[in-house]
Amino acid sequence: MTVGHLGQSLDGFIATHSGDSQFVTGDDNIVHLHRMRALSDAVVVGAGTVATDDPQLTVRHVPGPNPLRVVFDPGRRLAQTYRVFTDETGPTLYVCSQALVESGETRLGTATIVGVDCDDPSGGISAALGLLRSRGCWRVFVEGGGVTVSAFLQANLLDRLQIAIAPVIIGDGRPAIRLAPHARLSDCRRPRYRVFRMGGDVLFDCDLQADATLSDDNDPNVPPVNQVI
């Protein structure tokens, strides 16, 4: 099971144009993220998330074990100064292009370096996921950011996608999901979904392996639109 997650504004951004993203969503989503980490074998983020947020990717707000922390940086642009490469609160796997790993090189700070083939159509995403499965990581949580989650989604490697939407309008900034365009709406995916309230935010939990009409699986606990006014 591979699950992607993004927290975004009403207008579809995960950060401002300057990269300020802490925090688009509220405290309830932070707790949810920690719960998802605790339930996962591995948590994956891209280089942009590490560079912008310097996350720990550990479990702190709920009981549970720390997952394997995985940083996907195919272009190898990150220095070893970030917390995932300097602390020992949990194991870290640094995945980059095999072409950028020097002979005999195995470590980046406290992290283990693994090179993968990034020349395939998925840009190395498929190889990275295969690597995790070979290490026994079957429950994978792709926590961000937009580029990495979009790459997993474009490669059809996500089983579920969670989108937390906060009641904020950013106007312009770093987008959430960006995929190859479709000319017709009939070609666009409409996955089956469930809706959950998280404090002031709303979480859409989408099953990407099952299509549904817009009316399918509406949560009965969410009031219908005729009660808005």
Residue ranges and their predicted role:
Residues 1-229:
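Enzymes that bind and transform nitrogen-containing heteroaromatic metabolites
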